[in-house]
UniProtKB/Swiss-Prot annotation:
One of its GO terms (cellular component) is nucleus. Keywords: DNA-binding, Metal-binding, Nucleus, Transcription, Transcription regulation, Zinc, Zinc-finger. Residues 130-155 are annotated as: Disordered. This is Putative methyl-CpG-binding domain protein 12. A motif (Nuclear localization signal) lies at residues 140-147. A zinc finger (CW-type) spans 1-53. Signal peptide: none annotated. It comes from Arabidopsis thaliana (Mouse-ear cress). Residues 53-126 form the MBD domain. The methyl-CpG-binding domain (MBD) functions both in binding to methylated DNA and in protein interactions. Probable transcriptional regulator.
Length: 155
């Protein structure tokens, strides 16, 4: 789903190909309801929205053909989500360094035009700012004179 910049309504995108093109160009060419007229006749900002949530974020490059991208939302943690890429071989790649290592070991993908710039491990922003727990340092307990007396009595 993507959100119209004019009316702020959510629109369902029928294919990953359309979705990836919109996602890649969203900053340069903001999405508007009229964009969907190619696959949804008579679409406009006057039509009720298709949904109420969105798992997109702008400027994510399109995924190379045959590859897939997966975003795993964590249940309340210090990190909101993890992004993984899966090449046609099915391996899981968790970082830019792993992508580069994979491409170094599989030059056939490089020959097909796959390069590191086609992968983004940027995660979406949580809709609830309090979803991600803030890291805090544990409070160190200071020894009191009572603790010292207990240790002396153990001798």
């Amino acid at each position: 789903m993507v959100q119209c910049t004019d009316c702020k309504k959510w629109r369902l995108i029928p294919s990953m190909q359309h979705y990836n093109i919109i996602k890649e160009t969203q900053l340069q060419t903001p999405f508007v309801c009229g964009t969907t007229s190619g696959w949804t006749p008579n679409m406009s900002c006057n039509v009720p929205q298709d949904g109420t949530t969105c798992d997109t974020w702008p400027s994510i490059p399109p995924i190379p053909t045959g590859w897939s991208r997966s975003v795993h939302i964590r249940s309340e943690s210090t990190k909101f989500a993890d992004v993984y890429y899966f090449p046609p071989s099915g391996e899981r790649l968790r970082s830019s360094a792993e992508v580069q290592s994979f491409l170094d070991n599989h030059p056939e993908y490089v020959r097909e035009g796959v390069n590191r710039s086609q992968f983004s491990f940027q995660i979406p922003k949580p809709l609830d700012d309090n979803y991600v727990k803030k890291r805090t340092r544990p409070v160190k307990r200071r020894k009191s004179s009572k603790d010292n007396n207990c240790e002396k009595g153990k001798k």
